[in-house]
Amino acid sequence: RICTPIPFPMCY
C-alpha cells in the first residue's frame, strides 16, 4: 500500500 499526502491524502 502506498500513501501520499499530495495533492491530497490518499492511500492505494
Swiss-Prot record:
Sorted alphabetically, the keyword list is:
Amphibian defense peptide, Disulfide bond, Secreted
Look up the domain of life of the source. Answer: Eukaryota
What name is this protein filed under? Tigerinin-1O
The cellular location(s) given in this protein's UniProt record come to: Secreted
What organism does the UniProt record list as the source? Answer: Hoplobatrachus occipitalis (African groove-crowned bullfrog)
Described by its record, this protein's role is as follows: Stimulates insulin release from beta cells at a concentration of 1 nM and release of glucagon-like peptide 1 (GLP-1) from enteroendocrine cells in vitro. Reduces secretion of interferon gamma from peritoneal cells in a mouse model. Has no inhibitory activity against Gram-positive bacterium B.megaterium Bm11 or Gram-negative bacterium E.coli ATCC 25922 at concentrations of up to 100 uM. Has no hemolytic activity against mouse erythrocytes.
- The cysteines joined by S-S bonds are C3-C11
* Tissues and organs where the protein is expressed, per its UniProt entry: Expressed by the skin glands.
Kindly state a single biological-process term from the GO annotations of this entry: defense response
Query: Can you list the GO cellular component terms from the UniProt entry?
Result: extracellular region
